[in-house]
């Protein structure tokens, strides 16, 4: 058998064989699970479980992260092929591989929400990519009613009136922090209109999930006011 560090290196090397994509995710482990159809225990990839926690997240909102102790719990697992140290998990996560851990108290938890996008981008997180999939589908359904209408102020106003309430709802649900819709003569000049085209530009500020938590504890003397030391920390 291989050590955890050796196995981690092999997994990272395997990751390099895949192209960069925000539409793909990768974890680095196998689970030990009972196969009730054949009455044996066997190692099975976590792929189905990762899809399952994503599907379960849909019950809350598609744009929340499927990872963590709230939504990333994986059930009915009796063991894993690889138990990683923190250093191993850091190596995996740096390379876009989402670790699965055994926390104190038992159970298994997905502790990462990266996509396989190699370059720094908002789309290197699962929740952001899933958010934009939802937005693109919903807005595409709305814009189809503009087909074969006139590209004038009325049609452009109707488009904005359809999309804006939807994005406000997403913002209220914490999926995005802000947005802006541009659909006027600035992006629909005569040249666009003469080509029988219609343009709507939608700028989105997606919400980001917390991946790291830093806690700083400071002992304060009894006679000292808090506001005296807060800014000094």
Q: Can you say where each PLM-predicted feature lies in the sequence?
A:
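Structured, hydrophobic secondary-structure cores that serve as assembly/anchoring elements
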Residues: 1-233
């Amino acid at each position: 058998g291989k050590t955890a560090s050796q196995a981690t290196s092999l997994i990272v090397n395997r990751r390099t064989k895949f192209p960069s994509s925000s539409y793909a995710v990768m974890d680095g482990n196998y689970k030990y699970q009972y196969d009730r159809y054949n009455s044996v225990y066997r190692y099975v990839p976590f792929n189905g479980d990762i899809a399952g926690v994503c599907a379960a997240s849909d019950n809350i909102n598609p744009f929340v992260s499927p990872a963590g102790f709230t939504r990333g719990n994986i059930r009915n697992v009796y063991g894993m092929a690889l138990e990683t140290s923190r250093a191993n998990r850091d190596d995996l996560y740096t390379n876009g591989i989402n670790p699965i851990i055994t926390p104190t108290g038992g159970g298994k938890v997905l502790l990462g929400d990266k996509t396989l996008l190699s370059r720094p981008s908002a789309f290197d997180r699962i929740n952001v990519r899933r958010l934009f999939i939802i937005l693109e589908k919903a807005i595409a359904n709305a814009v189809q009613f503009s087909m074969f209408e006139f590209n004038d102020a009325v049609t452009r106003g109707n488009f904005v009136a359809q999309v804006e309430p939807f994005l406000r709802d997403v913002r209220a649900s914490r999926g995005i922090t802000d947005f802006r819709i541009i659909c006027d003569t600035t992006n629909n000049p005569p040249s666009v209109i003469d080509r029988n085209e219609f343009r709507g530009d939608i700028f989105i500020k997606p919400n980001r999930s917390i991946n790291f938590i830093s806690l700083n504890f400071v002992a304060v003397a009894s006679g000292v006011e808090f506001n005296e030391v807060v800014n000094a920390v």
